[in-house]
Each structure stands twice: as structure tokens, then as C-alpha cells.
From Swiss-Prot:
It comes from the Eukaryota. The gene is Abitram. Its main location: nucleus. This is Protein Abitram. One of its GO terms (molecular function) is actin filament binding. It comes from Mus musculus. One of its GO terms (cellular component) is dendrite. InterPro entries: Abitram, GCV_H/Fam206, Single_hybrid_motif.
């Protein structure tokens, strides 16, 4: 049996492929939908970000345009003591039905952030639901709030009522709508003398 040969056929040199793909989405971008509340309680630039998981859990964080995240701000301390009778640290949740969780409205304060320049910021819930947990790590390491606001520097975790889980996002902005608000705000301050 004669061996078949094809002398004209040559292997092409291997091609060098440069990866031009975008990096994979972060864990937060993969599993959470970002919602925003601009100018919370009518205070300009005090924007909050709500990360909503598919299981309806909401993680409350600061939006990138919040004054606390701007350069030059130094956080002096953070307090979950809302009033003399109310501390978010006393929230004790137990059981399948999350007994003992504090109920929050959209405007309920979660914590207060005190900056070294004397400014004080009250962070609100932005969603109705039960307070599952607060991030005690930011009490001891306030810099987490500025360094990793969407992950380790979150403020609190809120669980909306099941019946209200679809309506939670009413009144909140999508990522694109929020970016438009920030651009308009930037343009307005740039044109104002």
C-alpha cells in the first residue's frame, strides 16, 4: 500500500492571538443589579447605590459620586446609633422568618458618617424591608467605605417583603439613568460661574 504524500501542503506558522476581550465582569456585576437613588432626602450629590441580588436581597452602598468617596475626604468615624433609643447594631435576626429584624422605610436612616472636615452624612435605606445585617467592619476600618464601597465597604443588607420585591426598584435609577444624572449635574456645575 502506497503512502499518500502531499509535498505542497505545509503547516502554517502558529498565529499569535492577542486577547482583546474585555475582562470578565466582577462578582458584584455578575450577581447583582445596580440601582441608584440620587440626591437622597433632597441633599445634592448624596447618592446611594442599591445592589439587588436575584434572591431579592438588597445591599446598600454609597454611589461613586457621593461626597464621602471624593478625594480629600477623610472619615473620622461611623455610627449606627440613629437616636437615643435606636441603634442599628442592636438588630438581632433569627430563624427562617427573620424574627427580630428592624423594619425600615425608604427614608429610614441606617448610619451616620462623620468626616474630619466637620461634615456629617446620614445614609438612608432607600428600600422598604427588614434589616438583615449591618457592616460592623466599617466601624473599625472606616477606610473600607472609600476603598471598596461595593464589596467590603457596604453599609447594610436589607430584605424587602416578598410581595414588594418587584416594586422595590420603583423610584430608583438604572445605571444608565444615574450616569445621565451625574453628567447633567457635572455640566450644570461647570457652566455655573
Amino acid at each position: 500500500m502506497e503512502e499518500l504524500r502531499c509535498p505542497e501542503a505545509k503547516l502554517a506558522p502558529p498565529e499569535v492571538v492577542i486577547a482583546t476581550e474585555a475582562p470578565p465582569p466582577s462578582l458584584v456585576d455578575r450577581y447583582f443589579t445596580r440601582w441608584y437613588k440620587a440626591d437622597v432626602k433632597g441633599k445634592p450629590c448624596e447618592d446611594h447605590c442599591i445592589l439587588q441580588h436575584s434572591n431579592r436581597i438588597c445591599v446598600i452602598t454609597l454611589a461613586g459620586s457621593h461626597p464621602v468617596l471624593q478625594s480629600g475626604k477623610a472619615i473620622q468615624r461611623i455610627s449606627y446609633q440613629i437616636s437615643n433609643n435606636c441603634s442599628r447594631l442592636e438588630n438581632k435576626v433569627s430563624g427562617k422568618f427573620k424574627r427580630g429584624a428592624q423594619f425600615l422605610t425608604e427614608l429610614a436612616p441606617l448610619c451616620k458618617i462623620y468626616c474630619s472636615d466637620g461634615e456629617e452624612y446620614t445614609i438612608s435605606s432607600c428600600v422598604r424591608g427588614r434589616l438583615m445585617e449591618v457592616n460592623e467592619n466599617i466601624l473599625h476600618q472606616p477606610s473600607l467605605l472609600q476603598e471598596k464601597p461595593s464589596t467590603e465597604g457596604y453599609i447594610a443588607v436589607v430584605l424587602p417583603k416578598f410581595e414588594e420585591s418587584k416594586s422595590v426598584t420603583e423610584g430608583l435609577l438604572t445605571q444608565q439613568q444615574y450616569e445621565e444624572v451625574v453628567v447633567k449635574r457635572t455640566n450644570a456645575t461647570a457652566t455655573t460661574p
